[in-house]
């Protein structure tokens, strides 16, 4: 009985909102129709429906509850890490039973997937916004650092230690590939003498083979290596900084990051 009451409490507001929305729409539609006439009123209703009717009150409420669940999940991750994420603990914080939340997320893994998807999408959008303005690899690297510093726990969820027992679906790989594609394009646009893989090396030959990780990007091996070098070295510096390993070492992590970028931008000599 307790579970049923909780589920009714979580979903009940959606029913109330739906009823209120229908009542309001009916009254408004009646008034508008009387003043404007059938044809004009129909056009107005169509336009309003395209905007507000895209999501029903129930759907809006469901999205609101899911957003609240994710907010509590991020707080849990900040306090104890992603491996300790618990829907039952979130339910307790929200004042409902555990089974009530399974109406919104089928389980822990689905919730983690949603958080990872949100994180990757946020970073991919930030990187792409810079890329379309012509940002070079260094510019994209600054976007990465700013994004990571804004929310370290979000960064570590996608680039830190994998969550035990969790396996991300392939759709997540697609979003992460967008980030690499923008970096590859920026690296391919650099001057030919920019740092890259010297031809004839085993790694150069390896990069010339089909590259699933690059999602079929047409960048030449030198640009591929350049992008990998940027990605691995800068993530290394960022991960150490965000984990607090530079604390007490009497240097500015931002300057170290910039020095790494300078080294990556220097021509081969």
Predicted regions and their residues:
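Short helix/strand-bridging catalytic loops that position acidic/His residues to coordinate divalent metals
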Residues: 159-172, 250-251
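A short, mixed-charge helix-start or loop-turn motif at secondary-structure junctions
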Residues: 51-58, 105, 109, 165, ...
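Alpha-helical structural segments
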Residues: 64, 68-75, 79, 110-130, ...
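Helix-turn-helix
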Residues: 68, 72, 76, 80-110
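N-terminal intrinsically disordered/low-complexity leader segments
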Residues: 1-63
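Charged/polar positions within long, soluble alpha-helices
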Residues: 128, 149, 153-157, 239-242, ...
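Helical hydrophobic small-molecule/effector-binding pocket
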Residues: 138-160, 173-195
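C-terminal peripheral helix-coil segments that are non-catalytic and often amphipathic
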Residues: 2-11, 17, 185-269
